[in-house]
Amino acid sequence: MVAEGDPGNLVKIFHLLVLSASWGMQCWMTFVAGFVLIKGVPRHTFGLVQSKLFPYYNHIVLCCSFISLAIYAAYHPRELLSPSESVQISLFFTSLLVAALQARWFSPVTTKTMFKMHVIEREHSLGQGVGLSANKEGYQLLQEKDPKYKALRKRFMRYHGISSLCNLLCLLCNGANLVYIALLMPTL
C-alpha cells in the first residue's frame, strides 16, 4: 500500500535550503548581476564574464531543481497527490525540464553564437564600448553591410530570448514552490 512518509526535520531543512538558495541565485543573476555588469564593463568583457558564469549557474540551477523534485517526489507518492500537491510537483518538474534545456542547449548555443559575433565585431573595432547603447550606429551599419553578421545576430537574439524565457520560467516555478511551502507553514 502506498503511503506518504514524514521526511523529518533535516530533510525539510535541506529541501528548503536547496530551493531557496536556487531561487536567490536566480534572482541575483536575473535582476542584479547582468544589469550591473552591462553598465560597468565593455560589451565584450560582459559577454566573456557571462560565458564563464552561466555554465556554472545553469548547472547549479539544474542540480537544485533535480534535488528539489527528487525530495518532493520521494515523500509525495503520485497516487496520493492532492490537487495542490499535483501543481507543486508539476512546478518542480517544469523547473527541472526547463533548467536542463537551458543548461545543455540554449545557453551553450547562445554563447557560441556570441563569440562568433565578437570576432566580426573586433574586425570592425566594435565591442569595447560600455553599455548597450554604446556605438549603436556601428552595430547597425555592420548588420546592414555584413549578411553573415546579420544572420549571427538574428540567431543570437532568438536563442538569447529563449534562454531568458527559460530562466524566468525556472525562477517563477521556484518562486511559486516557495510560496506553496510558506503557505503550508503553521507559524514563523
UniProtKB/Swiss-Prot annotation:
Keywords: Membrane, Transmembrane, Transmembrane helix. The chain crosses the membrane at residues 18-38, 53-73, 89-109, 168-188. It is a multi-pass membrane protein. InterPro entries: TMEM205, TMEM205-like. The keyword Aminoacyl-tRNA synthetase does not apply. The keyword Membrane applies. One of its GO terms (cellular component) is membrane. It comes from the Eukaryota. It is found in: Membrane. Pfam families: DUF4149. Belongs to the TMEM205 family. This is Transmembrane protein 205. It comes from Xenopus laevis. The gene is tmem205.
